[in-house]
Amino acid sequence: MLENECLEFAASSDEEVCGLIVGNESLVRCRNIHQDPRRHFRISDDDWLETEAAGEITAVFHSHPEQKLVLSGADRSGQLATGIDWWLASGGKLRKFRPVEHLLGRTFKHGVMDCYTLFRDAYHLCGIDLPDFERTNGWWLRGEDLYLKNMAANGFHGVNMQDVQLGDVFIRRAFPESDPCHAMIYLGDNTILHHENTGRLSRREPLRPAYLRLTHSIWRHEQCSSLDFRGVFDDISAKSL
């Protein structure tokens, strides 16, 4: 099995190992030519071109010898440069990451790059995969309650404001008369990550009193203990560099 081969390769070295996945069927092992192979990896141009000549490269594989099953900031920059999935092995586990856009600085497009896309992608980078769902513009005015229906159906439960913690999701109204329709991810220290349909880019900012007044509920995933928010913070640091 391909995943097992990747894990065995990762376990064979106390440095980062790397390779290329061809056609989602085979692993081509590559030499890590980075000057600091315990903390980083680099695949040579020759290895990449030789592998590409043999078949379609569908993913990049590498390992983290330390216990860190999320992509680093350098990994995220590298992934977006390749535009393909990256597979990561660490601690005897394998995780596959889609090449989602950096979390900060996104341009809003409803149903494609909106507040739920940001929420879903942030959780993906932290280790929890959420489904996408169809949504048409104006659903928050038609009583469809997409957030409230989908939060409960996908492992989230409500929590109180006094118990809020890193990774919780605030669901608020866009304005007092609308249904709850906007997600804000709590980053700790009274800071949120969100993407509004106001012509502004996705951003992190303080949790403002105005946002709290419009908040309908706060949600926490049943597997919140498995969330590794280093995946979000490393992506933010990579975008901020």
Predicted regions and their residues:
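Surface-exposed patches in mature extracellular/periplasmic domains of secreted proteins
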Residues: 130-135
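...with weaker cross-activation on analogous glycine-rich loops/strands in unrelated enzymes
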Residues: 136-202, 207
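Extended, compositionally biased flexible segments
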Residues: 56-65, 195, 200-202, 206-217
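Glycine- and charge-enriched low-complexity intrinsically disordered segments
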Residues: 205-241
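Second-shell loop/turn segments in exported
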Residues: 104-109
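Active-site nucleophilic cysteine motif
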Residues: 110-126
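Conserved beta-strand-loop surface patch within small alpha/beta domains used
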Residues: 1-57, 65-98
